[in-house]
Structures are given as C-alpha cells and as structure tokens.
C-alpha cells in the first residue's frame, strides 16, 4: 500500500534470504524486481559464483533478458521472420550475464532441498539461542531476539509462526556494549570452535567510486545501513 500510494519502485535484495517468509509470503514476491545471489557462501550456490533477477513484469523481463544477452532483442530473435543470412538482433547495449547450463543444474538441485535446509538452519539457531538464553535473560549481555524461531505446538501459534520464517543465513546477536566488549566475546566463541564474525556490510554508497558521483548524499543515510 505504501509503495503504490507513493509510486515507489520496490527492489528486493534477497541475496541472503532464500526460503524466508514474511507475513505469509515468500521473500522475493513483494517487489517489482527481486535480486538473488548464488555465490559460494550463500544458502543456494551455483558452483561458486552466480545470481538471478526475478520479476513478474513482462516489460522489465524483456529488458533484463536483453541486458544479459549482449543487448539482443527477444522479439526479433524468437518472433520475427528473417531472410536467409546474417540476423541483425542487437538493438541495445548489453553484456554477457548468462549463467551456464552446469551452474543452473547445480542451483536447481539445491532448490529441491531448500525447505529442508531452512528447517535445519532454524533448528540449529534454536540450539544456539537456547544455550545462550541466560546471556540475554539473566545477564543482559545480548539483546533479546525479536523474531519467533520456535515452532509452537498449538495450532493457532503454529499458523502464526508459519507466517514468518527466518532463513538464518546468519544468526545475529546484538550486544549491550556496557556489559561486554565485542572482541572479547568473539575470542570466546572462537576458543570454543564456533565461527563468529562482525556485523554486516555498511552502506554501499560510501565506496570511493560513489564519492565522485553527483548522486553522493550530503549526509549519511542512517536508515540505509
């Protein structure tokens, strides 16, 4: 409603959210365009590198198809009759963003087990949060998680929990800085053979290449983190 009212073009970044559900809808089904990453550390990978753009807008799809295939015109290639000889098909600029057949096969096979993988990720996250609950309930070292990661036995709560499913690309813990230093906590995790990192990527516009652009904001966009 907000997007329609304000005439906003919605692009979903689903790079780390394969299989997630929000308000009963799969992530990637809200926007005009959804982007997906399949590089080596994502929930689904296509052999190391890769990605995908999805849309239900035919006009956008035709443009995207052209961009990934050297600027070819889809209708000229498939719907137009040509004389014998060379076919003139490139109506625009584009590049080679085409995924190989082998990469697609790897991704499609992983897609079959996506639901099972999400269940397993939720189960593992539940184990961690159960083991750490004293740290946020008793000692106030972590902020209490604000997502529902447990499946309830009651039908009412089960329906509610199915409306929101976390993909758990990562399990994020928010620290109370007054209680513990971040570096010390990370060292404790590593000591116990638990892989632990810091935060997430900051705003991309802060890269040097964008600083030279006329689009660079005069002030930090705090809500874009």
Where are these regions (language model features)?
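PLP-dependent aminotransferase class I/II
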Residues: 1, 9, 17, 21, ...
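Short beta-strand-to-turn element immediately C-terminal to the catalytic PLP-Schiff-base lysine
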Residues: 36-37, 51-56, 108
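Conserved PLP phosphate-binding loop immediately N-terminal to the Schiff-base lysine helix
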Residues: 1, 6-37
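A structure-centric signal for secondary-structure junctions around beta-strands
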Residues: 30-32, 47-48, 99-101, 168
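Short acidic donor-binding loop at the edge of a beta-strand
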Residues: 33, 50, 63
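Glycine-rich phosphate-binding loop of ATP-grasp-fold ATP-dependent ligases
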Residues: 43, 47-52
């Amino acid at each position: 409603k907000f997007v329609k009212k304000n005439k906003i073009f919605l692009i979903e970044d689903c790079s780390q959210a394969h299989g997630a559900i929000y308000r009963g809808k799969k992530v990637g089904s809200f926007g005009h365009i959804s982007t997906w990453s399949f590089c080596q550390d994502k929930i689904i990978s296509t052999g190391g590198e890769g990605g995908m753009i999805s849309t239900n807008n035919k006009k956008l799809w035709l443009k995207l198809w052209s961009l990934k295939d050297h600027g070819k015109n889809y209708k000229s290639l498939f719907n137009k009759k040509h004389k014998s000889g060379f076919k003139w098909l490139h109506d625009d600029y584009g590049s080679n963003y085409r995924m190989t057949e082998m990469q697609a096969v790897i991704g499609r096979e992983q897609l079959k087990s996506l639901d099972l993988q999400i269940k397993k990720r939720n189960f593992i996250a539940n184990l961690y949060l159960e083991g750490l609950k004293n740290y946020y309930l008793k000692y106030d070292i972590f902020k209490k998680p604000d997502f529902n990661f447990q499946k309830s036995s009651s039908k009412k709560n089960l329906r509610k929990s199915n409306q929101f499913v976390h993909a758990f690309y990562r399990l994020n813990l928010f620290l109370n800085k007054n209680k513990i230093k971040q570096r010390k906590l990370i060292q404790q995790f590593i000591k116990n053979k638990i892989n632990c990192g810091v935060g997430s990527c900051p705003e991309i516009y802060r890269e040097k290449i964008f600083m030279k652009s006329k689009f660079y904001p005069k002030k930090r966009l705090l809500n874009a983190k």
